[in-house]
Amino acid sequence: MLWFWIAYIIVTLIGILHTIFNIYVLHMKPMDKESMGEGYEKTKPWHPLYNIVIFTVFGFIYMNGLSNPTIAEAFITGAIWVSICIVFDVFGWVIIKHPWSLTFKQFYVEYQPWITLIYIAIFIGPILGFLLTLI
């Protein structure tokens, strides 16, 4: 679980820093009462990429630490990681209100296809990590 949480925190921080960069360096519009703002919206296509890279790296670290990793363990790990992420996201980004929280519609409808691609990336991260252990 340690590797999952480290990856999750890193991906979240990268997304936040990317948004801040867009707002302050590229002078994109920040969030307002109507939307999350241009600075955030322009980061969305990058979110699956952050996730596939980071979760593959941490999937590799996790799988490489096992005495005899198998592809079945990689699939199980991917399923566990994406399940935890889905549940945590509901609380962390929708239910618990904060300046960057979203509504259910914003997170699960308007964030398409990105959220689906993110969850696929998290699922396959340990699988790709396992494949890297074979090299």
Functional labels for PLM-detected ranges:
Residues M1-I80, I84-I135:
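Juxtamembrane/disordered regions of integral membrane proteins
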